[in-house]
């Protein structure tokens, strides 16, 4: 079989982009429907236009077809203006004027509910009322507030199509009738003309399918624009907006839409459809021909295909909470990388179940945290529980609240909680600390190994051990030199020089010649790879740079954790010593093999934990 050329790799398309291409090609043949002409300027749209865009929550945007062709946002502005009103005015004010129930009527129905309020903010009556509330608050600045909000959702500055605005204003008598109905029932202020002028302008804002996809993804991302990273609206406003979109976003087709497609969506008579699947993606499409409900014919087909092909119906979700735990073990199965002395090892071996480590992955949701808390209670009570979160991608507020309640229970049982793998500047940390800030039994370390090392130290202290970093360990006590005679040790000592290092000093550098090995005399050092991964923490009595016996260049960096001293043995002198003392040489290499084997056993144990949980 002839392999494909190298250029084929660079020309290959991601699966989602290929899917959108397929939709574009297949549905371009769909010619049913008609361009909206009750607003004359909209009737000038080219019915052949067809563009699709999909934005992911990590900020990537796929585009096919006429995705950059501008068109007016029309009713797709409604969810964003509703969210703006909730944040600007508060839910109480907005909900006192606008309902949230489906109407079952066309979008431009001149009818109110039994309380003489609009049924919901997705029909024209509700949208005009929403704009009116903002006008009452901001006056002449109302439209600019709305335009800026829409621009923040899109991630770029949006303008108005003045021709469409003028056309809407000239033919907007039905909306004027709705406006005066709202005024009669005290839903909006006396200045109906000014409110409608703002409404006509907001509907005439120019967007593209790409803009709509990014705006939809911002809704799906709890109000955070995935392209710009800006928190555009509060999570509260977004969740309420998505709720109304789900029940009423597609007007009198809303029930059929949620039954068949199951993604919160909003359409506009300009030919656009936006669909926002929470925590997943945002979709924007543009095709001017509409069906009898005022929805883009091709746009609906794209949404149907996406939902069906990838099984995206929001009520058909699977989330097995058991998948939240990637590893669950104690320090007997996977201790820290600190090389311990015999006394410390004995204490830790006797109390290995006192430190429990649970490594988590994915989303800390309510169901995931509940499962973890029950799993934790299924084994004997430890003194320390370490939750490693570096694989956690998000934390829900419900999950964070349940975390806090679980931590409170652990505090009552005198269990110390240690968090690792989450930076204090991160969104996940802020979500967790919102609920756990008052708890006194919670500590945090960024590195899991540092967290385990700290917990091990506490166990050593609690059970009568000591860790004296200032204690000196002479050559005779070095494990790598175990078994050497007094004469051999004396001769080896003669070739060594005692080096002193300040805290933070870099002792060895990756890639440098391996021309010496070191025996740590006092203090502590840590060994890391160039990417920052910590391989080991060493205390007095441990060797480092010993791989010089096997390698010609350094394969890791070594830093002093505190003031430290070490015996430095130049490699050429050490090799001469080994040649002159073959028995000692054989003993040293046997000790080295044992040290390497011990490290391999620890590494294999961790691999076994991660693959068997």
UniProtKB/Swiss-Prot annotation:
Enzyme class: hydrolase
GO terms for MF: glutaminase activity
CDD domains: CAP_ED, STAS_SulP_like_sulfate_transporter
PROSITE patterns for this protein: CNMP_BINDING_3, STAS
Record-linked InterPro entries: Beta-lactam/transpept-like, cNMP-bd_dom, cNMP-bd_dom_sf, Glutaminase, RmlC-like_jellyroll, STAS_dom, STAS_dom_sf
Residues the entry annotates as binding substrate: 75, 124, 168, 175, 199, 251, 269
Reaction it catalyzes: L-glutamine + H2O = L-glutamate + NH4(+)
EC number(s) per entry: 3.5.1.2
GO BP term, pick one: glutamine catabolic process
All residue ranges annotated as the STAS domain in the record: 345-457
UniProt keyword annotations, A-Z: Hydrolase
Binding site for a nucleoside 3',5'-cyclic phosphate: 480-595
Keyword Hydrolase belongs to the record: yes
Region (Glutaminase): 33-315
Family assignment from sequence similarity: Belongs to the glutaminase family.
Family matches, as NCBIfam families: Gln_ase (TIGR03814)
Subunit structure: Homotetramer.
Name the UniProt record assigns to this protein: Glutaminase 1
Gene, per the UniProt record: glsA1
């Amino acid at each position: 079989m002839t392999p494909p050329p190298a250029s084929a790799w660079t020309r290959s398309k991601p699966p989602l982009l290929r899917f959108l291409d397929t939709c574009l090609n297949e549905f371009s043949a769909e010619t049913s429907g008609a361009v909206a002409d009750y607003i004359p300027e909209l009737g000038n749209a080219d019915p052949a236009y067809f563009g699709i865009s999909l934005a992911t929550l990590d900020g990537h945007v796929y585009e096919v077809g006429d995705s950059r062709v501008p068109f007016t946002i029309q009713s797709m502005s409604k969810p964003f203006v509703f969210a703006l009103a909730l944040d600007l005015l508060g839910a109480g004010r907005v909900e006192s004027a606008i309902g949230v129930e489906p109407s079952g009527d066309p979008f431009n129905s001149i009818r109110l509910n039994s309380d003489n309020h609009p049924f919901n903010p997705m029909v024209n009556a509700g949208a005009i009322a929403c704009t009116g509330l903002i006008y009452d608050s901001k006056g002449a600045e109302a439209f600019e507030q709305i335009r800026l909000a829409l621009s923040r959702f899109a991630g770029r500055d949006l303008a108005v199509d003045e021709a469409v605005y003028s056309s809407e204003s000239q033919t907007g008598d039905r909306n004027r009738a709705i406006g005066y109905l709202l005024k009669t029932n005290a839903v909006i202020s006396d200045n109906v003309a000014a409110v409608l002028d703002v409404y006509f302008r907001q509907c005439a804002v120019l967007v593209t399918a790409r803009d709509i996809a990014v705006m939809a993804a911002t809704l799906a991302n709890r109000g955070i624009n995935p392209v710009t990273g800006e928190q555009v609206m509060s999570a509260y406003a977004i969740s309420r907006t998505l709720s109304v979109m789900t029940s009423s976003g597609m007007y009198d087709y809303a029930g059929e839409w949620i039954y068949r497609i199951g993604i919160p969506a909003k359409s506009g008579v300009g030919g656009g459809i936006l669909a926002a699947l929470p925590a997943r993606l945002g979709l924007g499409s543009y095709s001017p021909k509409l069906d009898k409900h005022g929805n883009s014919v091709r746009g609906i087909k794209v949404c149907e295909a996406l939902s069906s092909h990838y099984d995206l119906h929001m009520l058909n979700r699977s989330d097995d909470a058991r998948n939240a735990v990637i590893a669950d073990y104690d320090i007997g199965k996977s201790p820290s990388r600190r090389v311990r002395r015999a006394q410390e090892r004995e204490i830790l071996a006797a109390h290995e179940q006192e430190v429990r480590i649970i490594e988590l992955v994915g989303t800390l949701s309510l169901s995931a945290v509940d499962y973890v808390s029950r799993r934790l209670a299924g084994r004997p009570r430890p003194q320390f529980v370490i939750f490693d979160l570096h694989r956690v991608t998000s934390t829900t507020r419900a999950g964070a609240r349940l975390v806090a309640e679980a931590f409170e229970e652990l505090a009552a049982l005198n269990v110390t909680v240690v968090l690792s793998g989450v930076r204090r500047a991160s969104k996940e940390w802020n979500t967790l600390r919102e609920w756990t800030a008052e708890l006194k039994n919670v500590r945090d370390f960024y590195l899991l190994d540092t967290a385990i090392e700290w917990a091990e130290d506490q166990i050593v202290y609690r059970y009568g051990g000591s860790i004296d970093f200032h204690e000196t360990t002479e050559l005779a006590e070095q494990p790598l030199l175990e078994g050497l005679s007094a004469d051999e040790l004396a001769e080896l000592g003669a070739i060594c020089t005692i080096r002193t290092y300040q805290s933070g000093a870099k002792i060895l550098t990756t890639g440098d010649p391996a021309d010496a090995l070191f025996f740590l005399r006092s203090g502590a050092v840590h060994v890391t790879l160039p990417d920052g991964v910590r391989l080991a923490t060493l205390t007095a009595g441990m060797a480092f740079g010993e791989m010089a016996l096997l390698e010609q260049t350094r394969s890791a960096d070594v830093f002093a954790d505190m003031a430290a001293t070490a015996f430095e043995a130049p490699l050429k002198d050490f090799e001469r010593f080994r040649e002159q003392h073959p028995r000692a040489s054989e003993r040293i290499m046997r000790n080295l093999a044992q040290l390497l084997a011990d490290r391999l056993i620890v590494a294999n144990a961790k691999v076994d934990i991660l693959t068997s949980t």
